[in-house]
């Protein structure tokens, strides 16, 4: 995978001992399953073979489940897909999910990585899903972001 413009190389992390949770929606199953596969591969590569995985129906349900998971996990990865339709519903869902995840992260002081794809077309989502034909793997990227942030917070808290 070549990655999108500006995407950094994903660092190799030892996240042993980090309690990781992944919440993934079920709409656009092929894409969400691929995002989840990418997240699980990164977790395993970072020393976490058994992250907590919770499936929800749609993207709008992700923030409340992420909030509950943040109570007893060091990092949460949110995965889903919202594809623009012909009504304003897309904008409302994307805004609600993004604001919800940000609020949960700040309120809980737990990294919540936003791997919810918000695209204009299904093709754009497929190109970011981590499939063999995809340019990017947003599930993997979100997982690295969550784990790296959890490790940074652990280090900062150890020195405060």
UniProtKB/Swiss-Prot annotation:
Active site feature: 89
Gene3D superfamilies in UniProt: Lumazine/riboflavin synthase
Residues bound to (2S)-2-hydroxy-3-oxobutyl phosphate: 86-87, 128
Reaction(s) this enzyme catalyzes, per UniProt: (2S)-2-hydroxy-3-oxobutyl phosphate + 5-amino-6-(D-ribitylamino)uracil = 6,7-dimethyl-8-(1-D-ribityl)lumazine + phosphate + 2 H2O + H(+)
Pathway recorded for this protein: Cofactor biosynthesis; riboflavin biosynthesis; riboflavin from 2-hydroxy-3-oxobutyl phosphate and 5-amino-6-(D-ribitylamino)uracil: step 1/2
Keyword Transferase: yes
Pfam families, per the entry: DMRL_synthase
Family: Belongs to the DMRL synthase family.
Any further remark recorded for this protein: Was identified as a high-confidence drug target.
Listed name of the protein: 6,7-dimethyl-8-ribityllumazine synthase
Annotated organism of origin: Mycobacterium tuberculosis (strain ATCC 25618 / H37Rv)
């Amino acid at each position: 995978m070549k990655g999108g413009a500006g995407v950094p190389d994903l660092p190799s992390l030892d996240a042993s001992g980090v309690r990781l949770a992944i919440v993934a929606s079920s709409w656009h199953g092929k894409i969400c399953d691929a995002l989840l596969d990418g997240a699980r591969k990164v977790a395993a590569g970072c020393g976490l073979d058994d992250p907590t995985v919770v499936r929800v129906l749609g993207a709008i349900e992700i923030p409340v489940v992420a909030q509950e998971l943040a109570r007893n996990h060091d990092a949460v990865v949110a995965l889903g897909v919202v594809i623009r339709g012909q009504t304003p519903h897309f904008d409302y869902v994307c805004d609600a999910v993004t604001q919800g995840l940000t609020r949960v992260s700040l309120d809980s002081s737990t990294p919540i990585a936003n791997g919810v794809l918000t695209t204009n077309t299904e093709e754009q989502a497929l190109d970011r899903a981590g499939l063999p034909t995809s340019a990017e793997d947003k599930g993997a990227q979100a997982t690295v972001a969550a784990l790296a942030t959890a490790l940074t917070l652990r280090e900062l808290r150890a020195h405060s």
